[in-house]
UniProtKB/Swiss-Prot annotation:
Chain's gene name: nuoC
Subunit description: NDH-1 is composed of 14 different subunits. Subunits NuoB, C, D, E, F, and G constitute the peripheral sector of the complex.
Record's bilayer topology term: Peripheral membrane protein
Keyword Transport: yes
InterPro entries from the UniProt entry: NADH_DH_suC (IPR010218), NADH_quin_OxRdtase_su_C/D-like (IPR037232), NADH_UbQ_OxRdtase_30kDa_su (IPR001268), NADH_UbQ_OxRdtase_CS (IPR020396)
One Gene Ontology cellular component: plasma membrane
Cell compartments where the protein resides: Cell inner membrane
A Pfam family annotated for this UniProt entry: Complex1_30kDa
PANTHER family (UniProt xref): NADH DEHYDROGENASE [UBIQUINONE] IRON-SULFUR PROTEIN 3, MITOCHONDRIAL, NADH DEHYDROGENASE UBIQUINONE IRON-SULFUR PROTEIN 3
Function: NDH-1 shuttles electrons from NADH, via FMN and iron-sulfur (Fe-S) centers, to quinones in the respiratory chain. The immediate electron acceptor for the enzyme in this species is believed to be ubiquinone. Couples the redox reaction to proton translocation (for every two electrons transferred, four hydrogen ions are translocated across the cytoplasmic membrane), and thus conserves the redox energy in a proton gradient.
This enzyme's EC code(s): 7.1.1.-
Protein name: NADH-quinone oxidoreductase subunit C
Record-stated family: Belongs to the complex I 30 kDa subunit family.
């Protein structure tokens, strides 16, 4: 781990690299994502993209829960004090890379614009990014430039919005049911009320 960290610092700089829980996270600007990923693949042998996802930091450090978060168990968390200013940028794309030959992993994080969340596709670098990028587009609304087939992959064809965004209502916008009179599936405005049942916590 230390040898990899030293080599990465020499190439990308110390300020862009963070080590936490025996994992390395490299943060790069969205305009440099292709150049960075090529270096990681060609010079550091990160030949496999094992995961890609979008992250929405809109409500990071905030809570709708009035009680205290548990100090143990599944809902354990830490204080929200001082967390509101950690992420000024809202959307990030996170890549998890694996070097099979060296048995090393690294996380790459790149923030994108909130109004126009666009970043270049890495499908030409790792073919496995294809459906991952489609999923991030579908659920988070992040656009991947030069992706050859960027369409929804999980939600319905007529779905409106991106359901993993923090400002998307938890109850959804519409509900679907089968109408016996019309003999077809119909969409109606959602009929349930929103309710916060569990505390929002930040895992230790």
């Amino acid at each position: 781990m230390q040898d990899l960290k030293t080599s990465l610092v020499e190439v990308f700089g110390k300020t862009n690299l963070v080590e936490s829980f025996d994992e390395l996270t490299l943060t790069v600007g969205s305009q440099n994502i292709i150049k960075t990923c090529l270096k990681l693949r060609d010079f550091f042998s990160f030949d496999t993209l094992i995961d890609l996802c979008g992250v929405d930091y809109l409500t990071y450090g905030q809570s709708d829960w009035n009680g205290n978060a548990s100090a143990s168990g599944f809902s354990r968390g830490r204080s929200h004090q001082g967390l509101k200013d950690i992420h000024e940028e809202r959307f990030a794309v996170v890549y998890h890379l694996l070097s099979v030959s060296k048995n090393k992993r690294i996380r790459v994080k790149s923030f994108v614009d909130e109004v126009e969340p666009i970043i270049k596709s890495v499908t030409d670098i790792w073919a496995s990014a294809d459906w991952y990028e489609r999923e991030a587009f579908d659920l988070m609304g992040i656009l991947f430039e030069n992706h050859t087939d960027l369409r929804r992959i999980l939600t319905d064809y007529g779905f409106t919005g991106h359901p993993l965004r923090k400002d998307f209502p938890m109850i959804g916008e519409v509900e679907m049911r089968y109408d016996e009179d019309l003999c077809r599936v119909i969409y109606e405005k959602v009929s349930i009320e929103p309710n916060v049942n569990v505390p929002r916590v930040i895992r230790k």
